Amino acid sequence: MLTNQSHNDRIAQAVRLHRESIIGFLRELIAQTQHGEAAVQNAIAVASAKMGCKVERVKYDPQTVPMVQEFAAEQAITQGLRECVVAKTGTAGAGRSLLFFGHPDSEPLSRLAEWKHDPFKGEISQQRIYGWGVADDLAGVAIYTQAMAVLKACGLQPKGEVTLVSTPSKRHARGVSALLHQGLTADAAIYLHPAESGMGMKEIKAFASGQLEFRIRVQGAAPPTSEPLQTAFAHLAVNPVAKAFEVFQALQKLDEQRGKEIFHPLLDQAVGRSTNIMVSMINCDVADSLSRVRHECWLGGAISFAPPEPMDQVMGQVQNALAELAKGDSWFSANPPQLHWDSGVTGAQVNADHPLYQTLAAAIHRTTGHTPRVNPMHTSSDIRNPMVQKNIPTVGLGPLCGALSQNGQTDEWVDVEDYLAAVTVVASTILDWCGAEPANG
């Protein structure tokens, strides 16, 4: 009977032995990125089949996925059919089941000429592997794929069912949610994605705040003149910029109120506050003349809110704050600010004493010597999806990374040794959670 430490040592030895092929698979995914998402998915499907997994490719339409406590404006949702790769191994009902998911889609290719390293060759320099999408999220998909390959090399397999899914995620692609609403389930789930925080596996994602994104249209009125330059008549106009500032002040007041009333210990310990309303944009219609009153002004921003606060409650508070502006203001009474919600997701959390968290944390400690902590600052993390949609406890982890393209940077990278350690951690976690038995054949 293998102990957790002994099977971890056996797995770590296999990772060292197969180091080049484990890195090579990630380099293959990087190379396929230039050919598009379908090429990446095909490489994942082929590799999963070679490991003896039962592979299924599932097409779906993101716009028809029924979402629980989540929404997005139609124009924000990715268009057209997408495809998930689903690979299964182990035996359903023979032990606890585990779902791994990551996303194969990356940011649209851009600014490639600014890269110092070839974005599609997986170049390695100073223990970093570089490539387009390597940290978002090719490494995540590669980790759980190679973890299964390592178990096979060890002559081991999970007793319980393990499901590996490569699911589109960006721009509300909703891949994992599509599968969950089609019947995919598990006792627990782990989201594999390099840590954007820069902490690598010193942390576990077990907490995700919810987030709402909004825009508010504020109308104005030009002064009663046909003169092209309106500055001298400004006192006779309704300046939408000034009225937008009143809206901004109302949002600030609500933000201050919520900051006093809403408390979550993890967020408060990390940043001293548990919720925020951030106005990040103000924009008027075409400013072809600075001497004319604008017709309208738009404000936009986002709201973070801690679980378990309901999303509808937060939305209602914003609506009430805007409605209050009409009291005693004849302009807003006749022309109320128009609130548009662009998107919203609900937060979720797994406590640090949950068996899933404890299992993963123990595997990380055995492999790296570090005791991980919870990262509560990754707002709207994909760990929320199995929890909110189907009440499946979910955590996330990933290796050290940096210079992500989604942050406007170049030469995206993942730490090679941390990537290899993550493969060890995931393979060990599979056996700890699902149980181990000799591989067939």
Walk through the language-model features, giving the residues of each.
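Hydrophobic/aromatic beta-strand patches that form the interior of the parallel beta-sheet core
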Residues: E56, L98-F100, A188-I190, M278-S280, ...
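Short helix-capping segments at alpha-helix termini
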Residues: M51, C154-P158, L325-F332
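Acidic/His- and Gly-rich active-site-bordering loop/insert found
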Residues: L2-I129, P158
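Metal-dependent amide/peptide-bond hydrolase catalytic core
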Residues: M1-R10, M199, E213-G441
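Fold-level recognition of mixed alpha/beta catalytic cores in primary-metabolism enzymes, strongest
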Residues: I129, V134, L138-D255, V293, ...
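Residue-level signal for inorganic ion chemistry
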Residues: L29, T33, H193, A244, ...
